[in-house]
Amino acid sequence: MPSFDIVSKVEMQEVDNAVNQAIKEIGQRYDFKGSKSEITQEKDAIKVLADDDYKLKAVIDVLQSKLHKRNISIKSLQYGKVEPASGGMVRQIISVQQGISKEKGKEIIAVIKESKLKVQAQIQDDQVRVTGKNRDDLQDTIQLLKGKDLDIEMQFTNFRE
């Protein structure tokens, strides 16, 4: 029975490279001269520190552009709330989402069932497995999910006959 997996994985090495490029650009840009803005990465989180909300937005914009250039979807980032830090600065923690949460998995399964395609979907840890009798139904399912905006970056892997 043909099947495929829906996963949401981010290449952390690419995130690390994008963060390093953003740090380098912030150090060189004229509008950040004299600013204490910085970006640090800890496992699956990126911490952004800036002088004020305007600088914070500019730093995040630089980071997003570097991530986009490295083919990392902005959908895989979850932004924490902006909080005050010491010295009158502001901080925001951005977490990099790995895997599909149970809630998103249920949402994906609901979309698939709603479409009335002859496939079955089930949640397996942090991925969703879709099985069907023929390959065309699976390909239609992939196209359906690509067309929907589920606020999550999805990759379709492990396509088997």
Swiss-Prot record:
One of its GO terms (cellular component) is cytosol. The keyword Nucleotide-binding applies. Keywords: Nucleotide-binding. GO terms for molecular function: nucleotide binding. It comes from the Bacteria. It holds the Pfam family DUF520. The keyword Transport does not apply. InterPro entries: DUF520, UPF0234-like_C, UPF0234_N, YajQ-like_sf. Nucleotide-binding protein. Belongs to the YajQ family. This is Nucleotide-binding protein Glov_3198. It comes from Trichlorobacter lovleyi (strain ATCC BAA-1151 / DSM 17278 / SZ) (Geobacter lovleyi).
